[in-house]
Amino acid sequence: MAKIVVGLSGGVDSAVSAYLLKKAGHNVIAVFMRNWDSSLNNDFLGKKNEKNFTICPQEQDWLDAKVVAKQLNIPIFRIDFIKEYWDEVFSDLILKYQSGLTPNPDILCNKNIKFKHFLDYAQKVHNADFIAMGHYAKTDNGNLYAGADSLKDQSYFLGQLSKSQLQKTIFPLGNLLKSEVRKIANELGLINAKKKDSTGICFIGERKFTDFLQNYIPAQPGNIIDISTKKVLGKHIGIMYFTIGQRKGFGLSGMKEPYFVVGHNLKEKILYVSPQSEKKWLESDSLMAKNANFLSENFRNLDNLSAKFRYRQEAIPIRIEKIQDNSFWISYQKYQAITPGQQVVIYHQNQVILAGEIALLFRNGKKLDYLD
């Protein structure tokens, strides 16, 4: 049987993953990753409910992971990737917010930390044959597939992994529903069987987003302007706090209908908005993506392709129009609020074949200037 290092987070998914691998007869080793230090990383503003904790949530996760490892009778170790996370995930996050983009830190977190540095560590220190994570996804010979639980499927976040990374990775929960995972944990009496799922920024956790970003990017107030009438409707606290399609949180009151964010002018610090009745400002029918990751050699010959532009979105039909170097162009029926900086992940049935970072959007052949 194989030697497998499991990323044990303190949550129920990784705990059940470790159990299933051990039950199958594998030599299982648990490793807890610590990738964020609030003191070192100047993380003071934006913490949620910190008065309710007698211990910081990350340290509680470590304690839970140790108890689970003891319950499963497997060894556990702890490794820090704090510098790597800052250099290869968080710095990019801040840079993109400063540029008016809406990044997804989970994409880089998976690519550079969980399935790069963690994999290297597992192979070099523990001589592991494979690593395993509690993601709801499937792998087969370097191919990536959506998980059986459509509500929990995390293949979207894994679209930038290489085939070599996927060949060394096991997802024990790929064929299970979340309810089945909870049931297994309850039957085993695991300490975290009823623990709430983790949310928020990868390895950082829940934060009050606006306050949290002010730790790293000074607030730069400016005008909120109706993109059609050019009328100033109010003031915003900083462009980086708002994403395309957002309809709450920018302080407009007394309006006849809801308004949406439809664009940014970084130089003039203008936040462009539009009323709900003018949805054309949010609509696109094609896009260009960069940083392409090709996970299938035969995708050019495939029909019935679909794409997701955000997590938990239902995939929509698309057509690949052009591929050039590390970029690709796709077309689709008009769709709203696709956001520069996010990932587009393309599927053939339930297999991920291609992913990239959304760079440009178009409507009727004309480029949409979401960012000036």
Swiss-Prot record:
One Gene Ontology molecular-function label: tRNA-uridine 2-sulfurtransferase activity
Hydrolase in keyword set: no
Site (Interaction with tRNA): residue numbering on this chain: H135, Q342
Residue span of region Interaction with target base in tRNA: 104-106
Reactions performed catalytically: S-sulfanyl-L-cysteinyl-[protein] + uridine(34) in tRNA + AH2 + ATP = 2-thiouridine(34) in tRNA + L-cysteinyl-[protein] + A + AMP + diphosphate + H(+)
InterPro entries per UniProt: MnmA-like (IPR004506), MnmA-like_C (IPR046885), MnmA-like_central (IPR046884), MnmA-like_central_sf (IPR023382), Rossmann-like_a/b/a_fold (IPR014729)
Disulphide bridges: C109-C202
Pfam family, one: tRNA_Me_trans_C
Binding site for ATP: G7, L8, S9, G10, G11, V12, D13, S14, M33, G134
UniProt key word Nucleotide-binding: yes
Active site positions, chain numbering: C109, C202
EC id: 2.8.1.13
Top-level taxonomic group: Bacteria
GO BP terms in the entry: tRNA wobble position uridine thiolation
GO cellular component, one term: cytoplasm
Ranges for region Interaction with tRNA: 152-154, 310-311
PANTHER family: MITOCHONDRIAL TRNA-SPECIFIC 2-THIOURIDYLASE 1, TRNA 5-METHYLAMINOMETHYL-2-THIOURIDYLATE -METHYLTRANSFERASE
Entry's family note: Belongs to the MnmA/TRMU family.
Role: Catalyzes the 2-thiolation of uridine at the wobble position (U34) of tRNA, leading to the formation of s(2)U34.
Official protein name in the record: tRNA-specific 2-thiouridylase MnmA
Organism the protein comes from: Mesomycoplasma hyopneumoniae (strain 7448) (Mycoplasma hyopneumoniae)
